[in-house]
Amino acid sequence: MIKSTLIYREDGLPLCTSVDNENDPSLFEQKQKVKIVVSRLTPQSATEATLESGSFEIHYLKKSMVYYFVICESGYPRNLAFSYLNDIAQEFEHSFANEYPKPTVRPYQFVNFDNFLQMTKKSYSDKKVQDNLDQLNQELVGVKQIMSKNIEDLLYRGDSLDKMSDMSSSLKETSKRYRKSAQKINFDLLISQYAPIVIVAFFFVFLFWWIFLK
C-alpha cells in the first residue's frame, strides 16, 4: 500500500508532504533517504525510476520543475504507483503551476495539497479500485520499462540515476569492442593486401642472392 507522498521542486525545495504516521521509524528513515536522493538528482537523471529500499519501494516521477515521490510497501504494483504519481502531478500542476516556480516560495508552502493526496491515496488503497486501475493501465500502456535501482547502491556505493551515465557506459563498452574488432580487421586486410607482394619481393631477393652473391 501507499505509505507516504513527498513533492520537491527540482532545486531541492520541499513543496508538500503527506501527513503520515510520524511514529513509524522505518517510514521516517525512508523519508530521510528521499531527501538524500533529491540532493543527488541532476538534469541528466531519469525522469521516472523505482528505488528498492528493504521492505519498501520508492517511486518518483518528474514533471516540469517538480519531483513527485511515493513510498510504498514492497509488492505494491508499480504501474499503480506511477498512475498515482501521474494523477497527483496533473492536479498539482493544474492548481499551482503559476506559484511553485516563484523564488519567494517557502518550504512546504503547498501543504494544503495534502487533502487531495489523502483522497487519492484512499482511492488507490481500495481493492476494487486497485484491480480496475491495474487492468486499465495494462490495457492502455502495459507495464512500462522503468529504471530500477537498489537505493543502497545509489546512496552509499556511488551508483547514479543518470540516464546518460548508463548509456555512455554501454557506448564506451561497445566502442571498445568495435575498436578492437576494427584493428583486427585492418590488420587482416593489410596482410591479405601486402603478403603476396612481400612474398614475391622476398623470392626475387633470394633469387638475386642465389645467382650473384652465393
UniProtKB/Swiss-Prot annotation:
- Give the residue spans that cross the bilayer: 193-213
The record's Gene Ontology biological-process terms are:
endoplasmic reticulum to Golgi vesicle-mediated transport; intracellular protein transport; retrograde vesicle-mediated transport, Golgi to endoplasmic reticulum; vesicle fusion; vesicle fusion with endoplasmic reticulum; vesicle fusion with Golgi apparatus
Q: Which GO terms describe its cellular component?
A: cytoplasmic side of endoplasmic reticulum membrane; endoplasmic reticulum; endoplasmic reticulum membrane; ER to Golgi transport vesicle membrane; Golgi apparatus; Golgi membrane; Golgi to ER transport vesicle membrane; membrane
The answer to whether the entry has keyword Cell division is no
Name the UniProt key words of this record, in alphabetical order.
Coiled coil, Endoplasmic reticulum, ER-Golgi transport, Golgi apparatus, Membrane, Phosphoprotein, Protein transport, Transmembrane, Transmembrane helix, Transport
Longin domain: from which residue to which, for each copy? 6-117
Which residue spans belong to the Cytoplasmic compartment?
1-192
> Any ranges marked Vesicular in the topology annotation, and which?
214
Boundaries of every v-SNARE coiled-coil homology domain copy? 132-192
Taxonomy, superkingdom: Eukaryota
Q: What family is it from? A: Belongs to the synaptobrevin family.
| Self-association and partners | Component of two distinct SNARE complexes consisting of SED5, BOS1, BET1 and SEC22 or UFE1, USE1, SEC20 and SEC22. YKT6 can probably replace SEC22 as subunit of either complex. Interacts with SEC24, YIF1 and YIP1.
Its annotated function is as follows: Nonessential SNARE involved in targeting and fusion of ER-derived transport vesicles with the Golgi complex as well as Golgi-derived retrograde transport vesicles with the ER.
Q: What's the protein called, per UniProt? A: Protein transport protein SEC22
**What is the organism field in this record?**
Saccharomyces cerevisiae (strain ATCC 204508 / S288c) (Baker's yeast)
